[in-house]
A protein has these predicted regions:
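Noncatalytic scaffold domains of N-terminal-nucleophile
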Residues: 1-124, 128-130, 134-169
Length: 170
C-alpha cells in the first residue's frame, strides 16, 4: 500500500470502514506487473502481443453488452451520489462521455485505454511503475488527494507466492 497511508491515518479520518471508492482503499495496482511476470514465466508471446487484441477492441470499439450496461448504470448512480464528475472525473470521461450513459448495443471506444495497454505492452509494464504512466498516476493521485506517490509505484514488484492450501474432506 502507499507509504503515506496507514491504519492509524484512516482511523484519524474517523472512518468506521474503508470506503469502497475514492483514494482511501487504493493500493499500488499489481495487475500490469503480474501480467508481465506471468508472460515471462509461462508465455510464448510478448506482453505487447498478449495485450494487442484488448487494445484493438478499446480502439475500434465493441457493442456494449446488457450486463455491462447495467453495471455502468449502477456505477453512474453510485458515483453521482458520491461526488459526481467533479470527484470521479476519469470515470465519467471514460464511461459517460459528455455526461451521456451508453445503452445496450452502443459501441464503446476508448482510445486512452488502447494507448495505455499498448504502452504497458511495449515497456513490459515498466512505464506503469517507473515511466510516463507512473508519473501520470502519481501526479493525479497527489492532485486529487490520494496517498500514492511515484516511489510507491517504483518499488512495486509482483511476485509468485505459494498459495494457502488446506485439506478438504480428508
Amino acid at each position: 500500500s502507499p507509504r503515506l497511508i496507514s491504519g492509524e491515518k484512516l482511523l484519524e479520518k474517523v472512518l468506521k470502514a474503508v470506503p469502497s471508492d475514492g483514494w482511501d482503499p487504493v493500493m499500488v495496482p499489481g495487475t500490469p506487473s503480474a501480467w508481465a511476470e506471468a508472460v515471462k514465466k509461462f508465455g510464448n508471446l510478448s506482453l505487447s502481443e498478449v495485450l494487442e487484441p484488448a487494445a484493438k477492441y478499446a480502439e475500434e470499439g465493441y457493442p456494449l453488452a446488457p450486463n455491462i450496461g447495467k453495471q455502468w448504470v449502477l456505477g453512474y448512480k453510485r458515483f453521482m451520489k458520491a461526488g459526481g464528475p467533479e470527484k470521479f472525473e476519469g470515470w465519467f470521461e471514460t464511461f459517460a462521455p459528455d455526461g451521456k450513459m451508453l445503452s445496450d448495443g452502443d459501441v464503446f471506444r476508448c482510445q486512452a485505454m488502447a494507448d495505455t495497454l499498448r504502452e504497458i505492452g511495449a515497456t513490459n509494464a515498466e512505464s506503469f511503475y517507473r515511466g510516463e504512466l507512473a508519473k501520470k498516476i502519481a501526479a493525479y493521485s497527489e492532485k486529487t488527494g490520494g496517498w500514492m506517490r511515484l516511489d510507491d509505484l517504483e518499488d512495486y514488484r509482483a511476485e509468485f507466492v505459494e498459495p494457502i492450501t488446506t485439506n478438504y474432506h480428508g
